[in-house]
Amino acid sequence: MGRMHAPGKGLSQSALPYRRSVPTWLKLTSDDVKEQIYKLAKKGLTPSQIGVILRDSHGVAQVRFVTGNKILRILKSKGLAPDLPEDLYHLIKKAVAVRKHLERNRKDKDAKFRLILIESRIHRLARYYKTRRVLPPNWKYESSTASALVA
C-alpha cells in the first residue's frame, strides 16, 4: 500500500505462506494456540505483538490457518480486545509524542506540519472506524485528552 503523506510507493510487504493448511510438524492444537493468545493478551500485549511471539517462539505462521479465526476475533470473543484499534492507538501515541516535543521546541515548524498530517490521518481513520461501527459514533479525537487515551 502506498504512503499517504510521502512520495514512497510502499511496494514491500510480507508474503503469505502458499499453503493454507496447518504444517504437519506443528504440534500445537487450535485450543493450545487460543490459550497462548489469552495468556499473552492478559499480559497487555497487542494483537500484532501476540502474532509475532506466536510466529517466533511457537512456530505458528498464521493463527487463522490453525484456529480458523484471526487473533482480534479470538480476543473479542473472550472480551480481551483493546478499546481502540491498534493502528489508531499508535497514531494517537505518535501525535502525543510530537505534541510533547513541540512544548519543548516551539519553533520546530516541521514538527508542527507533521503533527497536522498525523492528526489528519487520525481523523480519517476515526471516520472509517465509525462507519464500520468499531468506534462509537460520538467518539472524537481531542489533543487535550489524547495523552489519557494512550497512558
Swiss-Prot record:
Cited SMART domains: Ribosomal_S13_N, Ribosomal_S15
Species in which this protein is naturally found: Xenopus laevis
Residues of the signal peptide: none
Subcellular location, record wording: Cytoplasm
GO molecular-function terms, A-Z: small ribosomal subunit rRNA binding; structural constituent of ribosome
Subunit (UniProt): Component of the small ribosomal subunit.
GO cellular component annotations of the record: cytosolic small ribosomal subunit; nucleolus
Similarity annotation: Belongs to the universal ribosomal protein uS15 family.
Pfam families, per the entry: Ribosomal_S13_N, Ribosomal_S15
Functional description taken from the UniProt entry: Component of the small ribosomal subunit. The ribosome is a large ribonucleoprotein complex responsible for the synthesis of proteins in the cell.
InterPro entries: Ribosomal_uS15 (IPR000589), Ribosomal_uS15_arc_euk (IPR023029), Ribosomal_uS15_N (IPR012606), uS15_NS1_RNA-bd_sf (IPR009068)
Record keywords, A-Z: Cytoplasm, Ribonucleoprotein, Ribosomal protein
GO BP: translation
Protein name: Small ribosomal subunit protein uS15
